[in-house]
Design a protein with these regions (language model features):
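Conserved glycine-rich cofactor-binding loop
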Residues: 15-16
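Catalytic loop of short-chain dehydrogenase/reductase
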Residues: 110, 130-163, 167-168, 172-175
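Rossmann-fold cofactor-recognition segment
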Residues: 50-67
Length: 256
C-alpha cells in the first residue's frame, strides 16, 4: 500500500509559531503533512487554521521522554503513507534573566526541556527514514541564540548552542544510514502575530522559514550540517515539493 500513496512529512512542534509556518509551506508545496503534538486543543486549532487543506493530519503524541518517543515512532511506522522527511520545529519559551542568578537545577531543567525532546526524536524517528526510497531528510530548526550569546537570555543561548552541536554530530552519524540530517538556523527572531507590532523589518516570517525548510527537502544538494535562513530567502520558488529518491552527496561538513 505504501507504494501507491504520496509520502508525508512529519512536523514536530507544528502547533508553535514557527511550526505553523512550516506546516503552511509544506501544504503550499502540495505535501501531505502529519503534525504531532501533546495538546489536543492546539492540534484542533491547527486543523481550524488549515480547514481547507485535506493533506493535513494530526496525531497526539509526546517526545518528553524516551518511552513516549518510542511509542510515537511505532505509531508513525504503522501509518499507510511512507515517511519522507521529519522537520523538528520544537523549542520552549525564552526565559529572561541572568545565568549567574540561576541555580544549576534551573539550567538542567532548561536543557531537559529544550534539547532532550530533539534527542528522543532523533533516536526513534530518524531510523524510520533509512530504508525509505523517498527523500530521507531530517531537518531541525535552530535559532540565532546558538551562534552568539543574547544579553538577558543566556539560558536560551546555552541550550540552543547545545542543540547546534548536537545537530552537527547527528549530521555526521546519519550519513551512514543514508539520511541527510541538517539544522536550518534562523538568523534573526521570527516575526509572528504575537510580536509583529515590535518586529524589525529584517525578521523573517514563519512562512518564509517554512519555505526555506521545504527547499532543503526538495532535491537540495547542499549537504552542510548547518544552513542559514534570513530575509534574503524571501524569493524562494513555491513549486510543488518533489520527494523522489535523493541524489548522492559528498560529505562536506560546515555551515552556510
Amino acid at each position: 500500500m505504501n507504494g501507491i500513496l504520496t509520502p508525508e512529512v512529519l512536523v514536530l512542534g507544528g502547533t508553535g509559531a514557527v511550526g505553523q509556518g512550516v506546516v503552511g509551506a509544506l501544504l503550499e508545496a502540495g505535501s501531505p503533512v502529519l503534525v504531532v503534538g501533546r495538546d489536543p486543543g492546539r492540534l484542533a486549532a491547527l486543523h481550524e487554521q488549515f480547514a481547507d487543506e485535506p493533506g493535513l493530519q494530526t496525531m497526539l503524541g509526546s517526545l518528553s521522554d524516551d518511552g513516549s518517543a518510542k511509542v510515537l515512532a511505532e505509531r508513525v511506522a504503522q501509518r499507510p503513507r511512507p515517511l519522507a522527511a521529519v522537520v523538528a520545529a520544537m523549542g520552549g519559551p525564552y526565559n529572561r534573566g541572568r545565568v549567574i542568578d540561576r541555580s544549576g537545577d534551573a539550567l538542567l531543567g532548561a536543557m531537559q526541556a529544550d534539547l532532550m525532546p530533539h534527542a528522543h526524536a532523533v533516536r526513534h524517528l530518524l531510523p524510520l527514514l533509512q530504508d525509505n526510497p523517498h527523500a530521507r531528510r531530517y531537518v531541525m530548526i535552530g535559532s540565532p541564540a546558538g551562534a552568539k550569546p543574547w544579553a538577558g537570555y543566556g539560558e536560551t543561548s546555552i541550550t540552543t548552542a547545545a542543540l547546534r552541536m548536537y545537530a552537527q554530530v547527528v549530521h555526521q552519524e546519519a550519513q551512514a544510514l543514508g539520511v541527510r540530517a541538517q539544522m536550518l538556523e534562523v538568523c534573526s527572531p521570527v516575526c509572528t502575530p504575537a510580536n509583529a507590532a515590535n518586529a524589525c523589518i529584517e525578521w523573517p516570517s514563519s512562512l518564509l522559514v517554512g519555505r526555506r525548510a521545504v527547499s532543503l527537502l526538495d532535491g537540495c544538494r547542499d549537504n552542510r550540517a548547518i544552513v542559514r535562513c534570513d530575509n534574503s530567502d524571501a524569493e524562494l520558488p513555491r513549486g510543488l515539493l518533489n520527494l523522489d529518491l535523493p541524489p548522492l552527496w559528498r560529505d562536506t561538513a560546515g555551515v552556510a
